[in-house]
Amino acid sequence: MDRVSHALFGWIAVLGAAISVVAILTLDAILGGESHRPGRTLRMATISEYVYTAGGWAFLTGVLALAVGSILLLAGLIRAGVVAPLSFGSILMSLWVIGLVGVAAFPKHNWEIGPSTSGSIHRVATLLAFVSLPAAVLAIARRHRQARPAVWLAYGSIAWLSVLFGAIAVSMVTDLRWHRIIPLGIVERGIVAFEVGAVIALGIWLIRGEFVTAKRLESP
């Protein structure tokens, strides 16, 4: 696979991630976290709540653009020989994409009506995506010196995830609701920021083609 092909796959990945960033920031700037539930703010409102607003199309566009960019990023890394088709890295990256598609396909619970099967699937898909991406980045890039920015961003997302799972753990041994223990909207945006950043960092790594040098450095 030549350098031009590397760059093409990498740029598509970066573009998909950038579209998701623009979509979320635009929704946050215009709606400020408000959804179909009055009084919601960025502190507590999740990004997925935008699906019930007039900006629902922008939310879906951002998620699907990120999914498309991520699968093409994986394809580029596989074709470049950096990732084996059947490896922890490729499987975890595929799970990240599956999670994103699930987030888009199954809207979260509409609490104006009540819990739903779609909302439960959405929650599982969200957790699948959140956990899979940093694990995929570490599996793919941790041994490559030139990919360190992606690795650092993956560790950043893990730090935010620890806050989320810590709240869930506390709720299991107390009467507190996990989503009220933490500012869920801020925590979720922290996770998303670092994970989308990691996708962009991997895309830039692919564009530069620096994995070739990294592979040589690893050779005995």
Q: Model segments located where?
A:
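Membrane-proximal helix-loop-helix units in multi-pass membrane proteins
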Residues: 99-145
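Small-polar-interrupted transmembrane alpha-helices in polytopic inner-membrane proteins
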Residues: 90-104, 159-169
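Terminal transmembrane helical module of multi-pass membrane proteins
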Residues: 140-220
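Interfacial helix-start motif at the membrane-water boundary
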Residues: 46-68
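Membrane-interface interhelical loops and short amphipathic "cap" helices
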Residues: 34-53, 110-119, 176-185
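Alpha-helical transmembrane segments of multi-pass membrane proteins
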Residues: 18-39
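Interfacial segments of alpha-helical transmembrane regions
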Residues: 8-15, 82-95, 147-159
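Hydrophobic alpha-helical transmembrane segments
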Residues: 60-74, 78, 130-134
